[in-house]
């Protein structure tokens, strides 16, 4: 664990092996404060970590009391969103803000225009190493985990000077760090600007930005850096008594769950076993203390998990299901393992770094020179799964999912409440914001159940457009009179799907320019296209797809991850600009359902086909609903019957909310500015139900037009023609 190897060297000298050997692990004191998470006690830190801290202590002089307190008492705004592109858009808007002068009014009035100082908000963009690293040798790794680990490697005390990161700020670089701080605060910069500034000055923007935090007024950062305690600690980020604003908050609960969930495959486990075994054999005579014992325990534990997955894979069990922790840890000798000690060892010994480093170093020279894309260090991934496995949470569950050639094991966080609670309790105020946050009940029930109602305020504002710029229709029947029922039991009706195609063709004739149709899933879109491509009757050249294409050219959103959303959008835009209009077939929850703006001619019509209810038969959703119902039952009072009814209602509400949040996101892709206008058509008889309509945003409900029971499709089409004619969109 002491000196780190030089992974960039091509030498294969035996001497290099010593750099991969774990330092003697002292377990005598591991029982002391083993559950403590504080880094303030040196007894909990490994020797190399202490050496690293000592080196940094020497590099940086202790700040004066004045320096330490500058900006600490001033309230800051931490603005958080899902992607860096959304944060860059916020930074762009922030540049337009004119701040009032901080000089007293009587002094500022005496200044001439030429003397007046233009003041900007002090803004800082924070990002991960992957977004801010400027070291070419590290940037080329591309994978976030590999970048993080290589960065840490280059800081190890034993790293040769010529191979250390030249951009890591030290005591001698203090002028550059101050220059970086001053330039950062001088103007509003997005994450790309921060990288460019770091390159220009020659200092790492990831580390240099830490010194800017306490001098900032607004700090922007992506979800993972705020929602993960370890990320906040790594950045030295405290939100105590500050204001937290979370944009795109409809994603918040899923984001918290995803950050604290881990998925691993059987093939990754098998690779980890092979690598650990190879490492243990290679260094068996040089591993001292408890290292050999703990490595053997890790191998036994990983083997036990892999064996159980293999037994599931070879059985007739369903494609997915719940897994008990006890079953995963039922292997030979695993019951003798102390999970708390082993968890502590994995975090302190840096075993994953040593093993993954040795594997990387030991690759065949030809492979290392082939410039292939590096993969995620597999043992780090396995370790991230083992930690929650050995420290199970009441809010977490384990599931397996069979693939064609592999099987996955997933640890899923079911309840985000406690992980978000520490943010809520530290911050002066927490603001959740979003364009389409309806329905709202989930935020109250699953993010703030412990907060008194008197401390919670909700605000809902109308859309920027006047109501007459939007028309929203529900459509329960097609042009051929077939009822639109896209429930699981009825959705494969060929007759209904054909009528859907004819109805879409008719709607495309009534709606000008671009129309975006959203389907519940990629699989169902494929099913529909299969039927639409079939010949109609005796004429083998006539198909439903051809009928639609005579109205508008059709483009598809592909499930293929190699197909970029930007490429689809560019082709879609070019087709519309040619004057022919276009129909874009997309998927709810897909690449084009969020974060993409179909403004003006790109989105004159939005069609929502069916309701994207999650698969209630899946093990994951059964566990989610069971957890929500049990939580509601435990928190209720009254008779047993009343409590059971409350529990069932809570589960049903949670299930419907998940569906309608996705629908509302798709609807929100159109209507992007005050002069925009569009038509929304929701195609399914269930959209007429009050409980479903009640979960639509208020600005949609006020423009809702319910079609008549007789010939509803014809009435809808006529209404759309009038709507667009009134806006001069039709010839």
UniProtKB/Swiss-Prot annotation:
UniProt keyword terms in alphabetical order: ATP-binding, Cell cycle, DNA-binding, Helicase, Hydrolase, Iron, Iron-sulfur, Isomerase, Metal-binding, Nucleotide-binding, Nucleus
Function of the molecule: ATP-dependent DNA helicase important for chromosome transmission and normal cell cycle progression in G(2)/M. May have a role in changing DNA topology to allow the loading of proteins involved in maintaining sister chromatid cohesion in the vicinity of the centromeres. Has a specific role in chromosome segregation during meiosis II.
Catalytic activity: Couples ATP hydrolysis with the unwinding of duplex DNA at the replication fork by translocating in the 5'-3' direction. This creates two antiparallel DNA single strands (ssDNA). The leading ssDNA polymer is the template for DNA polymerase III holoenzyme which synthesizes a continuous strand; ATP + H2O = ADP + phosphate + H(+)
Superkingdom, natural source: Eukaryota
Keyword Kinase: no
GO cellular component, one term: chromatin
Ligand binding (ATP): 35-42
First and last residue of the signal peptide: none
Native source organism of the sequence: Aspergillus clavatus (strain ATCC 1007 / CBS 513.65 / DSM 816 / NCTC 3887 / NRRL 1 / QM 1276 / 107)
Protein residues bound to [4Fe-4S] cluster: 133, 151, 165, 204
Swiss-Prot/TrEMBL cofactor(s): [4Fe-4S] cluster
GO MF annotation: an example: DNA binding
Placement of sequence motif DEAH box: 247-250
Official protein name in the record: ATP-dependent DNA helicase chl1
Start and end residues of each Helicase ATP-binding domain: 1-299
Nuclease in keyword set: no
Xref: InterPro entries: ATP-dep_Helicase_C, DinG/Rad3-like, DNA/RNA_helicase_DEAH_CS, Helic_SF1/SF2_ATP-bd_DinG/Rad3, Helicase-like_DEXD_c2, P-loop_NTPase, RAD3-like_helicase_DEAD, Rad3/Chl1-like
Region ranges (Disordered): 1-42
CDD domains reported for this sequence: SF2_C_XPD
């Amino acid at each position: 664990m002491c000196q780190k190897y030089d992974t960039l060297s091509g030498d294969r000298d035996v001497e290099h092996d010593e750099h991969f050997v774990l330092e003697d692990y002292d377990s005598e004191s591991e029982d002391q404060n083993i559950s403590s998470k504080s880094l303030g006690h040196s007894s909990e830190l490994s020797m190399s970590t202490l050496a690293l801290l000592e080196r940094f202590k020497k590099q940086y002089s202790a700040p004066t009391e004045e320096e330490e307190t500058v900006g600490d008492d001033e309230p800051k705004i931490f603005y958080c969103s899902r992607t860096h592109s959304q944060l860059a858009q916020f930074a762009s808007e922030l540049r337009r803000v004119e701040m009032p002068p901080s000089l007293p009014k009587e002094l500022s009035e005496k200044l001439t225009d030429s003397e007046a100082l233009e003041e900007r908000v002090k803004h800082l963009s924070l990002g991960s190493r992957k977004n801010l690293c400027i070291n070419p040798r590290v940037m080329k790794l591309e994978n976030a985990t590999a970048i993080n680990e290589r960065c840490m490697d280059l800081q190890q005390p034993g790293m040769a000077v010529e191979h250390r990161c030249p951009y890591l700020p030290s005591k001698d670089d203090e002028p550059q760090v101050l220059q970086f701080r001053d330039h950062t605060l001088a103007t509003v910069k997005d994450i790309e600007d921060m990288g460019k500034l770091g390159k220009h000055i020659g200092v790492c923007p990831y580390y240099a930005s830490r010194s800017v935090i306490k001098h900032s007024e607004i700090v922007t950062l992506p979800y993972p850096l705020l929602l993960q305690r370890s990320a906040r600690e790594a950045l030295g980020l405290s939100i105590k008594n500050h204001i937290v604003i979370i944009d795109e908050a409809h994603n918040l609960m899923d984001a918290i769950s995803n950050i604290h969930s881990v998925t691993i495959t059987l093939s990754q486990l098998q690779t980890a076993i092979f690598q650990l075994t190879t490492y243990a054999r290679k260094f068996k005579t040089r591993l001292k203390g408890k290292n050999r014992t703990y490595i053997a325990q890790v191998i036994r534990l990983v083997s036990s998990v892999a064996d159980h997955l293999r037994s599931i894979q070879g059985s007739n069990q369903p494609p997915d299901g719940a897994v008990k922790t006890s079953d995963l840890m039922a292997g030979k000798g695993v019951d003798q393992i102390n999970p708390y000690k082993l968890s502590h060892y994995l975090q302190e010994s840096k075993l994953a770094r040593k093993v993954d480093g040795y594997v990387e170093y030991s690759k065949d020279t030809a492979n290392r020179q082939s410039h292939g894309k590096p993969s995620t260090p597999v043992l780090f991934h396995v370790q991230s799964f083992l930690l929650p496995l050995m420290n199970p949470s009441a809010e977490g569950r384990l599931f397996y999912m069979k693939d064609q050639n592999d099987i996955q094991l997933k640890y899923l966080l079911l309840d985000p409440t406690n992980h978000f609670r520490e943010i809520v309790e530290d911050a002066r105020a927490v603001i959740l914001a979003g364009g389409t946050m309806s329905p709202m009940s989930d935020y109250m029930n699953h993010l703030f159940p412990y907060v008194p109602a008197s401390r919670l305020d909700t605000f809902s504002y109308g859309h920027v457009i006047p109501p007459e710029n939007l028309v929203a229709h529900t459509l329960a029947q097609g042009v051929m009179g077939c009822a639109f029922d896209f429930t699981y039991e009825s959705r494969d009706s060929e007759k209904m799907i054909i009528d859907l195609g004819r109805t879409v063709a008719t709607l495309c004739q009534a709606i000008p320019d671009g129309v975006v149709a959203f389907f519940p899933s990629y699989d169902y879109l494929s099913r529909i296209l299969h039927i639409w491509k079939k010949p109609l009757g005796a004429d083998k050249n006539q198909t439903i797809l051809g009928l639609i294409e005579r109205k508008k050219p059709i483009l598809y959103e592909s499930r293929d991850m190699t197909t970029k959303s930007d490429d689809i959008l560019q082709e879609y835009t070019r087709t519309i600009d040619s004057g022919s209009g276009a129909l874009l077939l997309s998927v709810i929850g897909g690449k084009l359902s969020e974060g993409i703006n179909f403004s003006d001619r790109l989105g004159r019509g939005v069609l929502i086909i069916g309701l994207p209810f999650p698969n209630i038969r899946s093990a994951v959703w059964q566990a989610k609903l069971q957890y929500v119902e049990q939580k509601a039952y435990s928190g209720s009072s009254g008779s047993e019957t009343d409590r059971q009814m409350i529990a069932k209602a809570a589960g049903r509400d949670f299930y419907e909310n998940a569906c309608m949040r996705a629908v509302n996101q798709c609807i929100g892709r159109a209507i992007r500015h005050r002069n925009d206008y569009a038509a929304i058509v929701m195609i399914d008889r269930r959209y007429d139900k009050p409980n479903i309509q009640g979960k639509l945003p208020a600005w949609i409900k006020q423009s809702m037009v319910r079609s008549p029971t007789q010939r509803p499709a014809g009435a809808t089409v006529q209404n759309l023609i009038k709507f667009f004619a009134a806006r001069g969109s039709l010839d």
